[in-house]
């Protein structure tokens, strides 16, 4: 789930990630929960950021642990981050231009994003190309 605030998006990193790699936040649906509600809950749990609008982007099969990844965009309704340090090592807002550099492996400080085998790569790519208009489909 890629949380957007205009020209910025929220990315986080887990301790086991490759050095310098950031990704969109992620989580699992709970029984009886809609995908949209899961996005709002997971973002709130991991970064304490409230989300308003949620828009479905795509799905992608994921073999570990036999899951279906559901890619969504979400509009941030606040931007103050409080990181859940059990879930994440860090979370921060990145400019769209920074994300483009991360995808191209040209970020000034060597930060990177997941490769094309992961749905988050495609979420980030769509955001770089279309900006916040990805929320309108």
Predicted segments with their positions:
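N-terminal strand-loop-strand
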Residues: 1-24, 28-29, 50-51, 74-76
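Nudix hydrolase/Nudix homology domain
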Residues: 18-22, 85-137
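Hydrophobic alpha-helical positions that pack around
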Residues: 25, 39, 43
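Surface-exposed, charge/polar-rich loops and edge strands
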Residues: 33
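Short, well-structured beta-strand/strand-turn elements
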Residues: 48-57
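Active-site-adjacent beta-strand/loop module that shapes the phosphate/pyrophosphate-binding cleft
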Residues: 60-85
């Amino acid at each position: 789930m890629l949380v957007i605030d205009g020209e910025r998006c929220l990315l986080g990193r887990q301790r086991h990630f490759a050095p310098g790699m950031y990704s969109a936040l992620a989580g699992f649906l709970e029984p009886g929960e809609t995908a949209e509600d899961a996005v709002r809950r997971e973002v709130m749990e991991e970064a304490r950021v409230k989300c308003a609008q949620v828009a479905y982007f795509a799905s992608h099969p994921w073999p570990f642990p036999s899951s279906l990844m559901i890619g969504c965009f979400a509009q941030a309704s606040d931007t103050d981050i409080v990181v859940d340090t059990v879930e994440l090592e860090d979370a921060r807002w990145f400019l769209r231009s920074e994300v483009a550099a991360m995808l191209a492996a040209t970020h000034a400080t060597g930060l990177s994003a997941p490769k094309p085998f992961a749905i988050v790569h495609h979420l980030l790519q769509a955001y770089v190309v279309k900006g916040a208009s990805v929320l309108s489909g």
